[in-house]
Amino acid sequence: YDLVDAIEGRCRPKQALVRHPQYANLFILASNKREPDKYVSPQAVRLILDNLSPRFDYILIDCPAGIEGGFHRAVASAEEAIVVTTPHISSLRDADKVISVLKSYKLKSVELVINMVRGDMIIDGEILTPKEISDILKIPLIGIVPQDDGVFLGERVAGGDAQKAFKLLAGNIARGQRRIFNVTYKYHGFFGSIRRSLKKSL
């Protein structure tokens, strides 16, 4: 079952949920597997999520890129928003447009996650710092995720920097903390300069 099955009454909303095989309290609701082009109204999505919300502490809605129908369906059902961007200028322009649209919705908060951040490039002044990005976009920073080649290749990297950053991000969301992962810590000092040189040569 998927979201459309629940909307059209072929199953109850909870029957459309798929439990994660490793985490008993994590469930996934597929959006529309069989008819991806079928129109689904924001109101219908909201009804399903309202039905499920008493069962969960958090419902995360993964929003498609761009400001199309899928974006508005997701935002219309949300109470808060997390804008995910990368430090690249084109991505920041897109994020700025998204934030402008989000302001038209009555959301409790709009916060920022910066993905694929390279600490070596920050130290060398090749990309904006997370604080500069947050200041430009005028929304608070809630987390940073460093670029991790293992994640990029689809590998499971236990104990890696990306995992540590995600744990801090989860704590910030769940407990209202503001602990931001330091992506530059490996690139300071003598050995850090060697790491930066090696990173550039790859």
Region roles according to the model:
Residues 61, 83, 111-114:
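Structural beta-sheet core signal
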Residues 51-54, 68-89:
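Inter-motif core of Ras-like GTPase G domains
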Residues 92-109:
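Conserved C-terminal guanine-recognition region of P-loop GTPase G domains, centered on the G4
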Residues 27, 57, 79, 110, ...:
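Conserved acidic residues
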Residues 14, 42, 46, 89-96, ...:
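Amphipathic alpha-helical transducer elements in NTP-driven molecular machines
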